[in-house]
């Protein structure tokens, strides 16, 4: 298929397509016209858009536009390339470092490099959806163009200002090299290292880690030999290193990984560590220098050395596998084997893949690659050359997923600080810079409903637009888990309630005991001999007895050693360090399960008491770019309180974990930043006060507490509502019980007449009058004392049961008459609860019983009460209804009419 022509009408385009299919079979098969010539294509370049195109003569070193359209044209063929400046490539903390003659380092901040301008672009070929472009305009147009499954290199011609060479990448001058590993070693350091998590957590963590963008804060170092090969031009070397990073960033974008360059360093005076043709020695020397010198002065995740030294054999790079984010192994070395920076970029991407846990793509793995082998294949091929690979295979993606799920790359989830992108601030570059509330890209590509793509501001009612702690344009509550722990040595992170971003990943301090595993944490991973045996030999494998480690690893040969001294010599293990050399196992599969080039090394050791012990080791025919997978991994427990470090069994006290844990008062653990991660209900930083748990690094643990508090409040509210509803329904009954039935002290002592007399009720005025007369005729000495009014009222309760009939009761002579004082009578028992008998004799007998005294004293004026009683007796029936009511609560006894009144007198005793 030819390059897309200038825009034409749809009908004409259809006719041209049909004619092309009939007359140009080779083009119909997808073979580009740009690839049919044997010699390099010489093209002219121009910039512009539409019908206005200006020839490219040179670019101003200080002015590189944010968006650039380039047209490459030769005769009737043309390519239009749409480019955007790769704003996220260089962090705001980016520094350039070189050295003076006396060895003093000079670090220049971003404000210096902005003078040179940001001249690194990513883009695509117009009309080709699967195309990819990575170019630099620092010194003319230079870079990589991929379309129609072909890779092309664009380079400026020395003899012309706007003439360029465009040729297939397979013609690029390069030294064909090999990573040297021809076996499949999937997940050597990762597979089965941890107990399998629950399926729910595995699915959730997989979605989170794969969906979230990972950021590798990278430092690239050029050794002295590279500086010399580039003509000792310091600026040229720096631009070359940044261009390499620009290509690598393009390679890793499909994996949702961004390469953020935080620094470049050039050893222009001398090498800062030993760099020789032995790649193994050079790698370890560089990693030691990074740990001791570079890390303390420059924070970063990974460092790569680009060397101008030609390594021995076919090795063009080397890196430890699954070592990303570690302090001692997160790095690699790369040989700059091509005139074009693309060659070193492909090798650096390969070695960085090893750091990510990716293994080589081999035939027995059945990997799927979008690019055919003759067109370059995939980046993790064991052997690389030309054409250069540009994509990752399905195996690489799977290895990366497995490594992330195992806890690798704990440092990759924090967004690097970006106050202002290198080269200037721009709305639409997907980086939230100073003064911006959000940035979702250009308006035509923005899919974020919380962000205004035109102004990079939040929409109305939106609080946030990006981040794991932002949901539906609102901040998640404090204590919401945003990143769970991935293994027994990892710590969870929680939203703070104030930021849309999840806190940076933290893990247990090195030397901390693993949870539920007999081992110690190291770089956020729990390593044990048993897990490594399962990795090498499959399920059922276990570590061999200690005598196997001691006998085999004391040999100092390829099958038993404590690491390499050089490329061809091995170190013997001391007795105390034997469990830090080649791992020895028992059981498992009949042969190693890590790859086709791994063989079993079996050793029989006789015992003094008879018999033999079978020790099984592993030897892998490696290249030179990867360490021996049969060696015990760093951080593995080798004795109680000791772990393997640098092939030596060392005490965990070297990490200072106990001193760090003491400040947590036994209510928390120490994380890798030497801060306390407190239990729930205890507050950081020292877990000595009540709080919400967590740490100053990972946010508060409040999710469970919030749920409990919310549930408690809801239950309380529901109970109150239910109680209020019941009260409302029973309000009349409650009011009657609480208010209408209450009596005062005096009212409780009074006899209240029933409001409605029972059936058959007879007025009792006659009886009351009869009794009243008797009382009048009673001798004075028979009455109770004047100062004791209780007898009168109690006797009234006993005998005066009903009002008297006013017709039969004679009216008293005077209402002012006062009854004579009553003498104290003998105490009588309580009044019977049933009516008195009809016979007078029985009534008289019952009168001898003395009733119980009242529970509360009567008022202090009995005389006045007696007077009122007399007045009440003299009232008429009409007056009686409204007067003082002295009727008892029980019905009055029925007296027979035939009882003579003259012969009976009721005595009140």
Swiss-Prot record:
Residues 656-688 form the EGF-like domain. Interacts with alpha-actinin-2 and with syndecans. Interacts with SH3PXD2A. Interacts with FST3. Interacts with RACK1; the interaction is required for PKC-dependent translocation of ADAM12 to the cell membrane. Residues 730-909 are cytoplasmic. A motif (Cysteine switch) lies at residues 177-184. Changing residue 893 to S: In a cutaneous metastatic melanoma sample; somatic mutation. One of its GO terms (molecular function) is metallopeptidase activity. This is Disintegrin and metalloproteinase domain-containing protein 12. Involved in skeletal muscle regeneration, specifically at the onset of cell fusion. Also involved in macrophage-derived giant cells (MGC) and osteoclast formation from mononuclear precursors. Keywords: Cell adhesion, Cell membrane, Cleavage on pair of basic residues, Disulfide bond, EGF-like domain, Glycoprotein, Hydrolase, Membrane, Metal-binding, Metalloprotease, Phosphoprotein, Protease, Secreted, SH3-binding, Signal, Transmembrane, Transmembrane helix, Zinc, Zymogen. The cysteine-rich domain supports cell adhesion through syndecans and triggers signaling events that lead to beta-1 integrin-dependent cell spreading. In carcinomas cells the binding of this domain to syndecans does not allow the integrin-mediated cell spreading. The conserved cysteine present in the cysteine-switch motif binds the catalytic zinc ion, thus inhibiting the enzyme. The dissociation of the cysteine from the zinc ion upon the activation-peptide release activates the enzyme. InterPro entries: ADAM_Cys-rich, Disintegrin_CS, Disintegrin_dom, Disintegrin_dom_sf, EGF-like_dom, MetalloPept_cat_dom_sf, Peptidase_M12B, Peptidase_M12B_N. The modification Phosphotyrosine is found at residue 907. GO terms for cellular component: extracellular region; nucleoplasm; plasma membrane. Isoform 1 is expressed in placenta and skeletal, cardiac, and smooth muscle. Isoform 2 seems to be expressed only in placenta or in embryo and fetus. Both forms were expressed in some tumor cells lines. Not detected in brain, lung, liver, kidney or pancreas. The chain crosses the membrane at residues 709-729. Residues 424-510 form the Disintegrin domain. Binds 1 zinc ion per subunit. Residues 29-207 form a propeptide. The precursor is cleaved by a furin endopeptidase. Zn(2+) binds at residues 179, 350, 354, 360. Its cofactor is Zn(2+). Its EC number is 3.4.24.-. Changing residue 792 to F: In a breast cancer sample; somatic mutation.
């Amino acid at each position: 298929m030819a390059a897309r022509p200038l825009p034409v009408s749809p009908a004409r385009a259809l006719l041209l397509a049909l004619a092309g299919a009939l007359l140009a079979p080779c083009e119909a098969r997808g073979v580009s016209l740009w690839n049919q010539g044997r010699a390099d294509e010489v093209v002219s370049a121009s910039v512009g858009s539409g019908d206005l195109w200006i020839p490219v003569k040179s670019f101003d070193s200080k002015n590189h536009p944010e968006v650039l359209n380039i047209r490459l044209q030769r005769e009737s063929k043309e390519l239009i390339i749409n480019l955007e400046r790769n704003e996220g490539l260089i962090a705001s903390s980016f520094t350039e470092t070189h050295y003076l003659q006396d060895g003093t380092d000079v670090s220049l901040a971003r404000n210096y490099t902005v003078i040179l301008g940001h001249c690194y672009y990513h883009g695509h070929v117009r009309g080709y959806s699967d195309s990819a472009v990575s170019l630099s305009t620092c010194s003319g147009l230079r870079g990589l163009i991929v379309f129609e499954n072909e890779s092309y290199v664009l380079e400026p011609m020395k003899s012309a200002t706007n003439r360029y060479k465009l040729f297939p990448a397979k013609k690029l001058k390069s030294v064909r090299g090999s990573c040297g590993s021809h076996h499949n070693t999937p997940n050597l350091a990762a597979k089965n290292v941890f107990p399998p998590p629950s399926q729910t957590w595995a699915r959730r963590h997989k979605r989170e880690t794969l969906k979230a963008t990972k950021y590798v804060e990278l430092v690239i170092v050029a050794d002295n030999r590279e500086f010399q090969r580039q003509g000792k031009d310091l600026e040229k070397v720096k631009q070359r290193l940044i261009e390499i990073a620009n290509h690598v960033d393009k390679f890793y974008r499909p994996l949702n990984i961004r390469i953020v360059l935080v620094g470049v360093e050039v050893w222009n005076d001398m090498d800062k560590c030993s760099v020789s043709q032995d790649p193994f020695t050079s790698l370890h020397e560089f990693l030691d220098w990074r740990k001791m010198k570079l890390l303390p002065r420059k924070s970063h995740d990974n460092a790569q050395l680009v060397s101008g030294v030609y390594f021995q054999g076919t090795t063009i790079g080397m890196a430890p596998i699954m070592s990303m984010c570690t302090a001692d192994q997160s790095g690699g070395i790369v040989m700059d084997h091509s005139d074009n920076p693309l060659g070193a970029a492909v090798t650096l991407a390969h070695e960085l893949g090893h750091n990510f846990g990716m293994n080589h793509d081999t035939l027995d793995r059945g990997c799927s690659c979008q690019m055919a082998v003759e067109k370059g294949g995939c980046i993790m091929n064991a052997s690389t050359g030309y054409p250069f690979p540009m994509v990752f295979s399905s195996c690489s993606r799977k290895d990366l997923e497995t490594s992330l799920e195992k806890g690798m790359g704990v440092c990759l989830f924090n967004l690097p600080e970006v106050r202002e992108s290198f080269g200037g601030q721009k709305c639409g570059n997907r980086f939230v810079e100073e003064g911006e509330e959000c940035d979702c890209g250009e308006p035509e590509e923005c899919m974020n409903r919380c962000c205004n793509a035109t102004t990079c501001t939040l929409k109305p009612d939106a609080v946030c637009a990006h981040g794991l702690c932002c949901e539906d344009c609102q901040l998640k509550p404090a204590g919401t888990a945003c990143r769970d722990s991935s293994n027994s040595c990892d710590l969870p992170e929680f939203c703070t309630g104030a930021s849309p971003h999840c806190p940076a990943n933290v893990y247990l301090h090195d030397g901390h005991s693993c949870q539920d595993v007999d081992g110690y944490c190291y770089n956020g991973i729990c390593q044990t001999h048993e897990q490594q045996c399962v990795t090498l030999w499959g399920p059922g494998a276990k570590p061999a007895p200690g005598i196997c480690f001691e006998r085999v690893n004391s040999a100092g040969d390829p099958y038993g050693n404590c690491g390499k001294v050089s490329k061809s010599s091995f170190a013997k293990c001391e007795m105390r360090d034997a469990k830090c050399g080649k791992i020895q196992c028992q059981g498992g599969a009949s042969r190693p399960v890590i790859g086709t080039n791994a063989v079993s090394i079996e050793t029989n050791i006789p015992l003094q008491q008879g018999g033999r012990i079978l020790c099984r080791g592993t030897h892998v025919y490696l290249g030179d770019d990867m360490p021996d997978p049969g060696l015990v991994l760093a951080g593995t427990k080798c004795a109680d309180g000791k772990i393997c470090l640098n092939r030596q069994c060392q005490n965990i006290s070297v990490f200072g974990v106990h001193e760090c844990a003491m400040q947590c008062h036994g209510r928390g653990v120490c994380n890798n930043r030497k801060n306390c991660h407190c239990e729930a209900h205890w507050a950081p930083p020292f877990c000595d006060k009540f709080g919400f748990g967590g740490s100053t690094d990972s946010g508060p643990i409040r999710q469970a507490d919030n749920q409990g508090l919310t549930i408690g409040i809801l239950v309380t509210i529901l109970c109150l509502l239910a109680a209020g509803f019941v009260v409302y329904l029973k309000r009349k009954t409650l009011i009657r019980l609480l208010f209408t039935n209450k009596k005062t002290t005096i009212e409780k002592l009074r006899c209240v007449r029933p409001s409605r007399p029972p059936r058959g009720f007879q007025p009792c005025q006659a009886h009351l009058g009869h009794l009243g007369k008797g009382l009048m005729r009673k001798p004075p000495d028979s009455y109770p004392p004047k100062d004791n009014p209780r007898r009168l009222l109690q006797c009234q309760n006993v005998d005066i049961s009903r009002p008297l009939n006013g017709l039969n009761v004679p009216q008293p002579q005077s209402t002012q008459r006062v009854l004579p004082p009553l003498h104290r009578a003998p105490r009588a028992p309580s009044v019977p609860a049933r009516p008195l008998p009809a016979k007078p004799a029985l009534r008289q007998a019952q009168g001898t019983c003395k009733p119980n005294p009242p529970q509360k004293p009567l008022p202090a004026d009995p005389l006045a009460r007696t007077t009122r009683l007399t007045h009440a007796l003299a009232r008429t029936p009409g007056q009686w209804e409204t007067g003082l009511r002295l009727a008892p609560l029980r019905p009055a006894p029925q007296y027979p009419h035939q009882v003579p009144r003259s012969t009976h007198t009721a005595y009140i005793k």
